[in-house]
């Protein structure tokens, strides 16, 4: 069902809408992962502040989803081990750890903003295609009623 020379078929529009829907879903999953990373960094910074304040007890999540907490006592120290990326970790003083975490958070926030921009473009294109498909469907329904 071609719309003329150089036109695009209805099947092409449907395939493009399907592709964009899957792409949008993928972007949304990635966006969620980035937001979870930002939240984890904020939690790590709060833990460092707790250590810096001299508080000797803290609640620590045992699992990633927060189903289990443990009260840990005897937390003292002036150094922590921080993730640098890939498989690299470093033991650094508390202030350096906060600087590293702040830098990482900035990087992730920029990536999240870029991803959000891409998500908005993809959603806009998807909505335009859906509008076109709805117009085609309405025109076909009117033609059928007119027969």
Swiss-Prot record:
Keywords: Chaperone, Cytoplasm. GO terms for molecular function: unfolded protein binding. The keyword GTP-binding does not apply. GO terms for cellular component: cytoplasm; prefoldin complex. GO terms for biological process: protein folding. Molecular chaperone capable of stabilizing a range of proteins. Seems to fulfill an ATP-independent, HSP70-like function in archaeal de novo protein folding. NCBIfam families: prefoldin subunit alpha. This is Prefoldin subunit alpha. It comes from Saccharolobus islandicus (strain Y.N.15.51 / Yellowstone #2) (Sulfolobus islandicus).
């Amino acid at each position: 069902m071609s719309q003329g020379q150089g036109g695009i078929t209805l099947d092409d529009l449907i395939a493009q809408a399907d592709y964009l829907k899957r792409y949008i879903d993928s972007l949304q999953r990635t966006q969620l992962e980035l937001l979870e990373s930002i939240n984890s960094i904020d939690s790590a910074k709060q833990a460092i502040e707790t250590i810096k304040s001299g508080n000797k007890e803290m609640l620590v999540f045992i699992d990633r989803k927060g189903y289990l907490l443990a009260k840990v006592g005897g937390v003292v120290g002036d150094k922590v081990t921080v993730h640098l990326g890939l498989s690299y970790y470093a033991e650094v003083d508390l202030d350096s750890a906060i600087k590293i975490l702040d830098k990482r958070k900035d990087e992730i926030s920029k990536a999240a903003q870029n991803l959000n921009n891409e998500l908005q473009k993809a959603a806009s294109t998807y909505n335009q295609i859906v509008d076109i498909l709805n117009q085609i469907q309405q025109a076909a329904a009117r033609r059928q009623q007119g027969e």
